[in-house]
Amino acid sequence: MIIDKLTIFGTDNIGIYIFTNDKYTIVPKNLDVETIQKIQETFKTEIIQTTIAKSFLIGIFVAGNNNVILLPRNVDDEEVKKIKDIARDVRVEILDIRPTALGNIILTNSYGALIYPELSSIEFKKIKESLQIDNIEKGSIANIITVGSVGVITDKAGLVHIDTTEEELDKLSKLFRVKIDTGTVNFGSAFIHSGLIANRNGVLVGSATTGPEILRIQRAFSD
C-alpha cells in the first residue's frame, strides 16, 4: 500500500479534483506530467484527463465504484465520450437528479452505498438503479448529511469523519462490507474527501496532512 502526499493547483484539497476507482483515475486537463505520474504510480490505474461540466472539480461532480462511474446531468457530450472511450470495462452513466455534486452526496464502493438523506424517493431509486447494488440507504455520518464529503471508502477499507461514533462505524462497516476507521486530513480537517483519494493500491493525501494523521490513515487502509 503506497501512501504519498500531493498538491494540486497549489492546494492541499486534492480530493475535489480527482476521482478514482481500482481501474481508472479521472483528473483535470492541463495537470502537469509529474503530478500525473505520481497519481498513476500510486493508484496503478489508467488516467483520463478531462473536465466535468467544464470544471476541474472532478471529485465534487463524479461518484462511483469499480462497476460504474456516475456523472452529473450537466456534463457535456464531449466529456462523456472522453470517459466512455477509455473506461470501456465499467458502465458510465449520467445521473438525472437535481443535485450535481455527486461526489458529495454519494458515498459508495462496490458493495454498498450511503446517500444524502434529503433526496426524493425518485432520485434515490435512480441512484440505486445506476449503482445496481441492493445494499444502499440514506443517512448521515457524524450528523453531516453530505456523506460523500466526510468519507472515502474503497473495496478494501474506509476512513470517515473523526467524530463518527462506534455505533455508526459498525453500521457503516456492515453497509460497505469493509473495515472502517476514523481520522482527519490536512492538519485536522474531518472532511476526508477533500484531502484524501484512495483505491485498493494506494492513498494520496494533501501535503498539509501530518505524520500522526498519515499513521492513522495507513492503519485504516493497510491489509
Curated annotation (Swiss-Prot):
InterPro entries: eIF6. It comes from the Archaea. Keywords: Initiation factor, Protein biosynthesis. SUPFAM superfamilies: Pentein (SSF55909). Pfam families: eIF-6. GO terms for biological process: cytosolic ribosome assembly. The keyword Protein biosynthesis applies. GO terms for molecular function: ribosome binding; translation initiation factor activity. Binds to the 50S ribosomal subunit and prevents its association with the 30S ribosomal subunit to form the 70S initiation complex. Belongs to the eIF-6 family. This is Translation initiation factor 6.
